[in-house]
Regions:
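Short hydrophobic beta-strand element within catalytic cores of glycosyltransferases
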Residues: 283-287
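Nucleotide-activated donor-binding/catalytic signature segment of Leloir-type glycosyltransferases, i.e.
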Residues: 227-246
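A conserved mid-protein helix/loop that constitutes part of the nucleotide-sugar donor-binding site
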Residues: 13-21, 183, 187-206, 224-227, ...
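Conserved acidic donor-binding segment of nucleotide-sugar-dependent glycosyltransferases
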Residues: 298-311, 319-326
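A short, active-site helix/loop in glycosyltransferases that binds the activated sugar's phosphate group
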Residues: 130-154, 162-164
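Aromatic "clamp/platform" in nucleotide-sugar-dependent glycosyltransferases that forms part
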Residues: 247, 266
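Short His-centered aromatic/hydrophobic patch
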Residues: 77-85, 103
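Glycosyltransferase donor-sugar binding loop
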Residues: 37-41, 162, 188, 213-227
Length: 356
């Protein structure tokens, strides 16, 4: 079987990370996979085809030719119009090809206005044209059904492939977080309003009795919001306590040097970085946004949770975690076991069950 993983754009975001991880997962199971895209900021690895084109009609033709040239048997693509493009290209190729559309984010963050009936209906049609729709979390699947985007029969949940290394038998560890001189905090993701770095800055403006460094790791998606975050840093006198790393690929390595991961997102689907933190045994504090964080942390069993936009709640969670060795080490020692849900082999098996 030859599987194409199609995304209109490859950048440093979470969906692109899914594309690369999915290809890596299939290759580890000796399944031929090809990435195809029409725009790329960066390209990592082999078996990647860049077809530079902005016209949707031409994209269909170019993708059809790609299918025939590479002898593709199935396509995994994203939500929105990519599913329709993939299905039309598959039909024109003359091959019986299954197309799977993967939903990575809740529909109200797809960029539609309330009155944008035409594009909403086109997105629904695109999902309907695909053979199957995959949601990356159970919460997201339920929302897609409830809001009428897809039927219950059409959609299933498959967690993203995040963990590729073997998870060894765990040995209990102990870190004296109460007496650590400086707490290194990882905040990973695009700098944009949905990731809510502003809430994190406001929360840590209230922390006076512990030394810490906020490590913002990720590219700038919204320049105006980035300026707002920097103004908040100055307003809260945090200039010497914040480090901007920019986009990075070595997240596992970075997490190993951190003490805590914090996510204050206003909306997610299945935040990969939280799974990476679990594998690296880094305790997590997260907002309760829709969807994904509560599911990953099992409603607080594997990390602390605060309400979206509640910077007072975030500062309270931080103080609770770093001033309680028992709590901190409980989360640390539960983390890797939880990360087993998100291994590459489980994802591959689930996708093959749909495709075969």
């Amino acid at each position: 079987m030859a599987i194409a993983i199609y995304s209109n754009v490859l950048d440093n975001g979470g969906i692109s990370k899914f594309v690369y991880n999915m290809q890596n997962a299939f290759q580890k199971e000796n399944i031929r996979s090809e990435i195809v895209t029409f725009s790329a900021d960066t390209i990592y690895g082999d078996n990647i085809t860049l077809l530079k084109c902005t016209n949707h009609g031409k994209r269909i033709i170019m993708l059809k030719n790609f299918i025939k040239e590479k002898n593709i048997d199935a396509i995994i693509t994203n939500t929105w119009f990519e599913g329709a493009i993939a299905k039309l290209a598959a039909i024109l190729s003359g091959k019986k090809i299954k197309v799977i559309s993967v939903v990575h984010i809740r529909p109200n963050l797809w960029g539609f206005s309330k009155n944008d009936i035409l594009r909403k209906n086109m997105a629904k049609l695109s999902l309907k044209m695909c053979n199957k729709v995959v949601a990356v979390s159970n919460e997201l699947k339920e929302a897609m059904i409830k809001e009428g985007w897809v039927s219950e029969k059409k959609i299933t949940t498959i967690y993203n492939p995040v963990i590729f290394n073997k998870i060894k038998n765990h040995k209990n560890k102990f870190i004296d977080i109460e007496n650590k001189n400086n707490i290194d905090i990882a905040v990973i993701g695009w700098i944009q309003p949905r990731k809510a770095q502003d809430i994190i800055v406001k929360a840590f403006g209230q922390i006076k009795d512990r030394s810490f460094t906020l490590n913002f790791i990720g590219g700038i998606e919204d320049e105006a919001f980035n300026s707002e975050v920097k103004m908040l840093i100055e307003k809260n006198n945090l200039q010497g306590k914040v480090k901007f790393w920019g986009p990075r690929k070595d997240i596992f390595k970075i997490l190993k040097d951190m003490d805590i991961l914090i996510s204050a997102s206003r909306g997610e689907a299945l935040p990969t970085v939280m799974i990476e933190a679990l594998y690296c045994e880094r305790p997590i504090i997260s907002s309760d946004c829709d969807y994904g964080p509560k599911e990953i942390l099992d409603n607080g069993k594997y990390g602390l949770i605060f309400k979206v936009n509640d910077y007072n709640g975030l500062s309270k969670c931080f103080n609770e975690m770093v001033n309680n060795n028992e709590l901190y080490n409980k989360f640390l020692n539960l983390s890797q076991e939880r990360s087993k849900l998100f291994t590459y082999d489980k994802a591959v098996k689930s996708y093959l069950e749909i495709l075969e």
